[in-house]
Amino acid sequence: MKIAFLFLTLDNINWHYYWDKYFDGHNSKYSIYVHPKYPEKVTVPWMKKNIIKNLVNTEWGIIVKAYINLMEEAMKDPKNMKFITISESCIPYQSFDNFYNFLKKDNIKTSYIKSLPIKSYDWKERIKKQKNYKDIKHWRKHLARFCLSRYHVQILLQKKEELKLFYKMHVADEFFLSLLPSSKFIKDFSVTYDNWDYIENEIKKINKKIEKLYIKLENEKVNNNKNKINNKINDYKSLKAKISANPKSYIKVYKKDFNDVNNSKAFFWRKFPKNSNINNFKNKILEKI
């Protein structure tokens, strides 16, 4: 059994030396496939030599076709039995052996997809705006980082017509696995830890501030002051929309953050931008992988 690592990036992965250590000594157990937005900027050797030929334009929220192209290329190797999506801000957090053995203990058909609740906004602004959305019998929302079995990738790639709906749908990377039938071979588990709890708490704080401003607005008599309050409300709404688009970005990492990822049992961790201080904990991470 081999694991196909599907890297979807802008150019280089942000923290490649963690991956250097992760892959070291396991050559026969993995394959690498890379879809960069800017292939000419890729300099990491193991990424550069594994860039797939069929590249497509990507932007935030529009990446499903790139995922499919990565899967199609990875399926050419019959030894690839598991397919995991990796972003540029992701680092490994457990050893390769730990992940490999975790995958082997379940049925070979098993995929790991973390489900999310479909909110009213999703139905209104994303799903129902698709012309043929009713053709999808059972909509599923999920994290965009997942690990699929060869069994499920085969099913997915056979649905060429149905996939077209997701190529232009915004944030379809959180919905396109709706094409997979419900199955005992799908486990509700995220192999990659994203800190959405932090974002939810920040949104709650913003909502409280907005609520207080609305109360203040009701009691305000001066029009000029009303305009100022409305501007503040709109600023908070814009901030809420901005931060709700992504999980926490770890520019500053603290010791307590490790408790969260440890409790999740995940094998990978994100998001770490290039200006993160994650290297303050370099030895701690290298010891784990």
Where are these regions (language model features)?
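ER/Golgi luminal nucleotide-sugar-dependent glycosyltransferases, focusing on the catalytic module
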Residues: 1-289
